[in-house]
């Protein structure tokens, strides 16, 4: 995805000129994973925009276009940009944990992007300890799908529902990335040594 060029993906935004540089909207972007995504993309000449609350590391990336809001019903700046014709090659969603938020974001952005990349988790699997997992393996489910509180027992099933929400809003245009454990500089969990 990083370093790609826009092309005719069959998206509602239509084909773009072959020499048009890629542009990515990062949902989040200033927490743990997001800055690494932003830095890798900008190093490759990709134009980046950020959408977040502006609360975590707001000093980061002063040169990058920013949209402020909250995924919990405060998408106004992003909605205005989409209505004004703003388009991106892709979205990288580093801050999706609640299916309703992912559904709302993906639905809003569907006409404005070619592809949606959702950072999910290996925890989506009903049995993440299984060797040789594939996309065909069963995902965990919540007894009550209206649950939005993140806990050890709900995290994986919520991420699975987020994947489904993005895919429902943008059929055929979603990539779900299911990392096992993300560690590295800036990790607030102290797993990185």
Where in the sequence are the language-model features?
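N-terminal Rossmann NAD(P)H-binding glycine-rich loop of SDR-like oxidoreductase domains
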Residues: 23-44
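N-terminal export signals
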Residues: 1-13
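Active-site regions of enzymes building and remodeling cell-envelope glycoconjugates
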Residues: 61-70, 134
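Conserved Rossmann-fold cofactor-binding substructure of NAD(P)-dependent oxidoreductases
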Residues: 67-88, 100-101
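N-terminal Rossmann-fold cofactor-binding loop
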Residues: 50-55
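NAD(P)-cofactor binding segment of oxidoreductase domains
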Residues: 86-142, 160-165
């Amino acid at each position: 995805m990083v370093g790609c060029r826009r092309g005719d993906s069959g998206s509602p935004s239509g084909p773009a000129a072959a020499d048009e540089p890629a542009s990515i909207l990062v949902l989040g972007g200033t927490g743990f994973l997001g800055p690494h995504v932003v830095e890798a993309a900008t190093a490759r000449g990709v134009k980046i925009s950020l959408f977040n609350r502006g609360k975590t590391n707001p000093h980061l990336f002063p040169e990058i276009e920013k949209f402020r809001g909250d995924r919990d019903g405060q998408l106004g700046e992003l909605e205005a940009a989409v209505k004004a014709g703003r388009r991106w090659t892709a979205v990288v969603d580093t801050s999706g944990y609640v299916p309703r938020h992912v559904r709302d974001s993906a639905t809003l952005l569907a006409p404005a992007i070619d592809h949606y990349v959702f950072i999910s988790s290996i925890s989506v699997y009903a049995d993440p300890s299984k060797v040789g997992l594939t996309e065909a393996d069963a995902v965990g489910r919540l007894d009550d799908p209206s649950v939005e509180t993140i806990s050890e027992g709900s995290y994986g099933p919520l991420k699975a529902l987020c994947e489904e929400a993005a895919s429902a809003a943008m059929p055929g245009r979603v990539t779900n990335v299911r990392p096992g454990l993300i560690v590295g500089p800036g990790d607030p969990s102290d797993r990185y040594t």
